[in-house]
Structure formats: C-alpha cells, structure tokens
Amino acid sequence: MGFPRGDVLSILDYSRENLEYLFLVADQMEKYLSEKKKLHLLDGYIVALAFLEPSTRTMYSFQSATYRLGGKTLVFTSETATSLAKGENFADTIRMLDSYSDLIVIRSKYEGTARYAAELAENPVINGGDGRHEHPTQAMIDLYTMYKIFGGIDGLTIGILGDLKYARTITSFLYGLTRFKPRKVYLISPGILRLREEVRNKIAELGLSFEETTSLQDVIDELDVLYVTRIQKERYPDPIEYERVKNLYRISIDTLRNVKKEFRILHPLPKIDEIDYRVDETPYAAYFYQAKLGVPLRMALLSLVLGVWRG
C-alpha cells in the first residue's frame, strides 16, 4: 500500500489501495487540523496555483492546504493576469511556473491542458480540472466523503443526477467508483444530458454496474447517495440548449419524502437552483461536509505527491 509520487492527472492512474492509503493520510491531517497542530511538511516549498478558469473551492482549498502544511503559494487566477494576455505561449508560461515552484496545480477550460503541462514541467503537476475531461482531486474528495460517512464505498447504491454530458466531476467520480464495488449506480438525466459514450464505454469496460434512467423518483428510495451537479452553463456552445435543460431537475423537500434514513446528498459545488435551500438544513445534506473535507484530503495529496509524508 502507498501512493505514487508525481503528477496527478487522472483518477484512473490510482488503484483502490492507493486511494485508501490517501484516505488514511487525510484522516491524520483532519486530526491535526482539529488539534490546531502546526505542521512544517512543506516548509521551503512553493505551490503554483495556475487557475486559468474561475474557481473558489478548488483554488482556495489547495491554498489553505499548502498554508496548513507550512508552504507558500504563487497564485495566477486568469489568463489576463499573466503574460498570456500579452501573447506569451502556454508552454513558456508553464516552464516559468515550473522554475518558480515545486508543484503546479492547473485548471483550464481546455481538455488535455494538465497532461500537456506535465509533459513540459520537471516538477509534479496536479490537474485541477481541464474542460469537461476530468477533475481527479474532486473525485478523491467525493469518494473520501462516502468513506467517512458510510465507512466504505462497497455495497452502496449511488444515483448521479444532472449534467452527465459536460460535468468533469461526474466523469472522474465514475472513474473513481470503478476502483470499488458499489452495489449499483444509477445515471439519472434526460437524453440530451446523457453520459458521453466514451465515458460510458470506459466504466462498462472496467466493470462498473450501472443503469440509465430519466426519472429520479423511480429510484430515489433505493439510494444511499445522490450525487448532484449543476448544469454546466459555461460548457454549452449553444445558449438555447442550456435554456432548455437548466431547470429539468430540482431537489426539494418533497423529493426526499421516501428516502432512506441514512440517505445523503453530495454536490461538488457551486450549486445554483438544483437544490432547494431548505434541503441544506436537513440531515440528508452532506455537501458542506464534503467541501470541508477538501482541505485535509488535499493536504494529504500534496504531502504524498511531494514525498514529504512520513507517517
């Protein structure tokens, strides 16, 4: 058991044993945080946060994780804030960031950006989200949340609701689930937002049992977990298509009337109108706890990727 050093580009690069080891280290980080223990694992390290697409939770949780470990950050929050706006090519920007830091976390609206950056950089690169492709560290948090709430992932019945076509969080979440043995996975969306064929084929190839449906109410009473995503407005090339689908699903108090007692809702956030604000106050809402776990999980990830963890 252990966790490989180096780039974090796809959750498919990790085994179940790798992920479970990451969760154990995250548990230890969570304990340190609760004890207000000052850590020095990243003393002398600089983490570059190259966020060329808007972010709140991912960027700030990586920044907080770095600070909590004793490191420092360089933050680039948009293309306009760097020499990219002056015409500098992307490769030169990555080489510059690589020379200034010990690790790069990168987010971009373009698929494949993180992998290309990793080919250029000598230091590790972490994919903070690349277009509709993947968001591996969010999936690690999602899996860790279920691990914390249920004591494991095997045997759970999981529903995934919303924009299955464009949401990179769903792609990585499904890829992560292939490393475990959930009882069943329901993919819940209208045909226009159906999971992309290449993702569907990949999870089938990896042995994940799933069923597609358009009706949440037909399956919600079976679920242990409902993973909800917003409609990805920024990924829609056609605004008319977005207008057609933006309000197709909404979780209300009434939606939850027959759910299991232990049922929980996850959401990678931000949520817009897809969950009624009154649901936030119910015991079913686990998404704020999920967001809170982002810091200890990313603390664990940084310490393992950089090889400074000595647990």
UniProtKB/Swiss-Prot annotation:
MF annotations from Gene Ontology: amino acid binding; aspartate carbamoyltransferase activity
Keywords, sorted A to Z: Pyrimidine biosynthesis, Transferase
Positions contributing to L-aspartate binding: K86, R168, R230
A Pfam family assignment: OTCace
SUPFAM superfamilies: Aspartate/ornithine carbamoyltransferase
Gene Ontology biological process: 'de novo' pyrimidine nucleobase biosynthetic process; 'de novo' UMP biosynthetic process; amino acid metabolic process
Pathway given in the UniProt record: Pyrimidine metabolism; UMP biosynthesis via de novo pathway; (S)-dihydroorotate from bicarbonate: step 2/3
Subunit structure: Heterooligomer of catalytic and regulatory chains.
Protein name: Aspartate carbamoyltransferase catalytic subunit
Organism name: Staphylothermus marinus (strain ATCC 43588 / DSM 3639 / JCM 9404 / F1)
